[in-house]
Amino acid sequence: MTGILVAAIVAAFVTMLVTPSVRRWSEKMGAVDQPEARRINTAPMPRAGGIAIFLGFLIAVVLTVTGRHFARSGQHTWTMQVLGVLLAATWLAIAGLVDDFKNLAARWQALAIILAGLILVAFGVRIEGITNPLGSTLGGKYDPLVNWHTLSIGASIFLTVLWVFIVTKTVDAIDGVDGLAAGVCAISAATLALMAAQLHTPEGPTLALIAAAIVGACLGFLRHNYHPAKIIMGTIGAWVLGLVLAAISIMGAFKVAAAVSVLVPVLVLGVPIFDYIHVLTRRLLARAPLTAADKRHLHHRLLARGWNQKQVVWFIYSVAIVLCITALALFQVGRLSH
């Protein structure tokens, strides 16, 4: 537990201290969101704040995991999976920063995220199995005792990359109101940290450290991003947070062999996922491009009803908390029944 607190505190402290420098650098280099019809900011806003989030997260993980490495004689600390998460996060930090400056086309954004997912797979982070309500009809290896379907390599890679893509894009999509994405990600990461700490696996404590570092980085960034925001996280922040949350859920929440295992990570990340599904559905019905930016997201619709930014943020925080509490309850059911 001490290590988890240290990871969160270090990440929060580093992120909070670095953000003002990142803000000045973003303004100087031109990484700024200009006011326009689909945005809510009324003045230019520095948008590369994710640099601070990434640095806070990275420094906290390196320090705490290395500390645990020496305390545990290297057992289940600096594993290939942990290295894969950091490498994939670093790749998306670079790609996200490029997008914050150059506004990459949708196909290049998709390619960057897919490559990050493949990096995770190459380092052993993948969805190995899921609960299967259809029994053994999907092929592969099926265990009827726990209703667990072990995926083929091809299916495993596909679902892993798809999950990483969905989570990363959905986190990016909710970054539209001051403090929203950082707060929701902090709530989700805290839930995943609690789950990881209860896993009866050697890597559970290390996963908890990584999740705690995300919590700390988000809270440290909120010091500057909560309304009225002085800086936004930009693509770099949203992509790093989405990637790490997706990876932690794969290594933790998906491991529960029970009828609820697929629901757990979906509920933990329910706010961005359900919002994104709703928006995509409305775009399809309107025959609008799926990648087109618009004001169909929940936070936009609440603002249009006359809510202020703080009301919107705290309402969505509350929804996220309810979903995460539900996920924790289902996780306990799955863990005890396994």
Question: What is each model feature region?
Answer:
Residues 34-46:
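Juxtamembrane helix-capping/reentrant segments at transmembrane boundaries
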Residues 80-121:
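Hydrophobic alpha-helical hairpins/lids featuring a short glycine-rich hinge
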Residues 43-46, 78-79, 137-155:
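Short aromatic-rich membrane-water interface segments that cap or initiate transmembrane helices
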Residues 119-131:
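Proline-centered turn/helix-capping motifs that create local helix->coil transitions or kinks
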